[in-house]
Amino acid sequence: MKLKYCGLHQQEDVEVAAASHCDYMGFVLANSKRKVALPDVAQWLATTDMSTKQTVALFVNESLDTIAQVASSDLFDVIQLHGTETPAFLQAVKDRTQKQVWKAIHHSSSALGIMQAFAGIADGYVIDCKSAKGWGGTGESFDWKQIPSYKEEGVRQGTQVLIAGGITPENVVELARYQVDGLDVSSGIEENGKKSVAKIARLEQEAGVHYARNNTR
């Protein structure tokens, strides 16, 4: 199971995530309280051991030129599109940047159909909760009973599917029985606006223990 810690927006966050067991470190380059500036990210990463991590740049309905400009910095391994971008736009981003591109899809009755439209184009998916509060990082979760449908579609496409939205150390155990490809966590590992070492440690312990047990059945 992969772990992605998103919404890193200060040096301390980067250091905490880099010292954790996460696989991906996410940075928001869209309008958000966690939005970061490229020069700051460059400075943070330059002083951090990133040898075992991959970086993800998150955009929401951004222009192709801006995404390409950010990608050319070579600070990021993955581009994540978190808005209403089309399959054609995602393909254009891939062609222009030569990066892995993930598509975030907000859970709804039409979400599976949207996911199917990106088959053969998206390199991965993040299934998030649809919320009036924002595109992501709201702390709200969707009905996890729907996860198997997304997992099945991910298997059919041969792509990984990460689950996002309202995941915390207290409820991560509930995800164990779904054996998801990965978790995308932001507000659930924060305290006073910063990524919390204690919350990350607890989440990793809970997820690790219960996923190990589940996978031995």
From Swiss-Prot:
Annotated keywords: Amino-acid biosynthesis, Aromatic amino acid biosynthesis, Isomerase, Tryptophan biosynthesis
Keyword Lyase annotated: no
Single Gene Ontology MF annotation: phosphoribosylanthranilate isomerase activity
Highest rank taxon of the organism: Bacteria
InterPro entries: Aldolase_TIM, PRAI_dom, RibuloseP-bd_barrel, TrpF_fam
Pathway stated in the Swiss-Prot or TrEMBL entry: Amino-acid biosynthesis; L-tryptophan biosynthesis; L-tryptophan from chorismate: step 3/5
Any one of the GO BP annotations: L-tryptophan biosynthetic process
EC number: 5.3.1.24
Top-level EC class: isomerase
Catalytic activity, reaction form: N-(5-phospho-beta-D-ribosyl)anthranilate = 1-(2-carboxyphenylamino)-1-deoxy-D-ribulose 5-phosphate
Family to which this protein belongs: Belongs to the TrpF family.
HAMAP family (UniProt xref): PRAI (MF_00135)
NCBIfam families the UniProt entry points to: PRK01222.2-1 (NF002301)
Name of the protein this chain belongs to: N-(5'-phosphoribosyl)anthranilate isomerase
Record organism: Shouchella clausii (strain KSM-K16)
